[in-house]
Amino acid sequence: MKILVVGGGGREHALAWKLAQSPKVQCVYVAPGNGGTALDSRLINLNLHLPSELSAWAATEKIALTVVGPEAPLAAGVVDEFRAKGLRIFGPTQAAAQLESSKAFSKAFMALHGIPTAEFEIFTDAVAAHAYIDKKGAPIVVKADGLAAGKGVVVAMTLAEAHAAVDDMLASNAYGVQHNTGDDGQARARVVIEEFVSGEEASFIVLCDGKNVTALATSQDHKRLQDGDQGPNTGGMGAYSPAPCVTPAIHAKAMREVILPTIKGMESDGIRYTGFLYAGLMITPDGKIKTLEFNCRLGDPETQPILMRLKTDLADVLIAGADGKLDTIELQWDRRVALGTVLAAHGYPMNPRKGDVIRGLPGGDSSVGNDAVVFHAGTARVGDETQVSGGRVLCVTALADSVKQAQARVAQVIQAIGFDGMQYRRDIGYRALK
């Protein structure tokens, strides 16, 4: 069968890489793909972007399954477009994707359905937002309402930071947020301001087929740019799986208090949820959980280590998800740890520089031995060179018997790779070593 992966980041490279391993799959198309998918003979890049273009092409080519990686096509209604043409696709509809595309919708939904989350208020007026911050004090969290490539959240440790974030989001839109439409039909800037919750974060990702839910392996992302969780927030600088902080008790609590009430709540609101659902959880020191955010897709970079550990045929899993038969699938996992470190461009996250030539990359399927893979994200083939084309450039991911050994293997692979201004963290997985 032929499969289409929509997207061009590290998550999509990992999806295509895993799907291409299935004996049932003859070809994986990636739209638009990146420099890494271009190098792999099992994968074919397509220069298609619009939902209408993608669905027309998939119908003509008799694509057996389409899976969507990034948030933007989901928010644009790519799943609705495919289903209207009777094409099999795994992902949430445009209405369901509001859980991610609108922070205001998401917080109101959680409040309505009793899903544990931080106390919050929603503002369109800067004066009222500034007054609320002064009343609540710092630390406090300011979130842009709209898609912002994972960078529209400021964890303000001081009042000055919080006030600046409100001005950036409401007045100047410094984060380039795609604004949502309000009840009056007008698109405008909104912010969600919420209490700061301390604890340990975990990425809890499940597959949903409309009625059945299957949890993926647990993982933990590292949002800050620099070692020791310093510097600005990013789309994610590395991840590892499994996450020791998600104990069996926390796992059961997350399913019971967050995931299942979300699926049931969406259904009671007239929206059937299908696709991946990612709950960003904060596990407090006293063992409670709070939902920081929902994403309607796999996390990036969490996907890379999770899929390195998955032993089950991913094509079987996603087809069962698209056909409402997830109850027939049991996921098998490699018992080893997988850890991925992101190599980012000079100037990332605010102003990444493009065009730098990347040296020392493995060719073909991007693997290094049988225990490491260099997944591409912001890369492009220009002539015979692979160049930096985005903020997060590569994710070097390895399997090993322990976090420490996985860190060492990743560091070894990174030594062979280079581009001007390359920045990365050397402490991914540090919480598991405490």
Where are each of the predicted segments found?
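ATP-binding N-terminal substructure of ATP-dependent carboxylate-amine bond-forming enzymes
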Residues: 1-94
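Short acidic-hydrophobic, aromatic-tinged amphipathic segments that line or gate anion-handling sites
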Residues: 44-50, 121-125, 156
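Generic C-terminus detector
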Residues: 50, 379-383, 387-434
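A conserved helix-loop-beta module that forms one wall/lid of the active-site cleft
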Residues: 90-152
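Short, conserved charged micro-motifs
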Residues: 129, 161-164, 350-352, 401-408
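Internal nucleotide-binding/catalytic subdomain
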Residues: 156-303
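Active-site "cap" helix and flanking loop/linker of ATP-utilizing ligase/carboxylase catalytic domains
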Residues: 255-277, 295-363, 367-369, 382
